[in-house]
């Protein structure tokens, strides 16, 4: 029973070393990766939030429209 347990522990240790060494090698920065030296600051020009808005078109006001929201005698007297 003891030799079988020793072989299982040794096999698990070898598998652990193989798995951890492959993960470390993948995370290491090599010559194939390009590092950016100039990091842009988050401003209004290059912000992702303002990139979704249309360019050159004014944003309509958020007030209710007087054309389709006006009912005659809608106020209680």
Curated annotation (Swiss-Prot):
Give the molecular function GO annotations.
Answer: signaling receptor binding
Q: What is the effect of changing residue 66 to A?
A: Reduced binding affinity for RLK5
Task: Kindly list the biological process annotations in GO that this record carries.
Answer: defense response to Gram-negative bacterium; floral organ abscission; lateral root morphogenesis; leaf abscission; pectin catabolic process; regulation of cell diameter; regulation of gene expression; response to ethylene
What does the entry note on its domains?
An extended PIP motif (50-69) is sufficient for abscission induction.
Subunit structure, interactors included? Interaction with RLK5.
State the protein's name. Answer: Protein IDA
RLK5-binding, as annotated region: 56-69
Protein role: Involved in an ethylene-independent separation step of floral abscission. Promotes abscission zone (AZ) cells rounding. May act with RLK5 and HSL2 as ligand-receptor pairs.
Phenotype upon knockout is:
Floral organs remain attached to the plant body after the shedding of mature seeds despite a normal floral abscission zone development, including abnormal petal breakstrength (pBS). Delayed cell-wall loosening during shedding associated with less pronounced and delayed abscission zone (AZ) cells rounding.
Q: Which domain of life is it from?
A: Eukaryota
- What are the alphabetically sorted keywords of the record? Secreted, Signal
Q: Which InterPro entries match?
A: IDA-like
The primary site where this protein sits is secreted
């Amino acid at each position: 029973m003891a030799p079988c347990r020793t072989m299982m522990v040794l096999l698990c240790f070898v598998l652990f070393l193989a798995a951890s060494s492959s993960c470390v090698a993948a995370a290491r920065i090599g010559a194939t990766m390009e590092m950016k030296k100039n990091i842009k600051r988050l401003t209004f020009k290059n912000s992702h939030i303002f990139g979704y808005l249309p360019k050159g078109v004014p944003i309509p006001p958020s007030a209710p429209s007087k054309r389709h929201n006006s009912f005659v005698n809608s106020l209680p007297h």
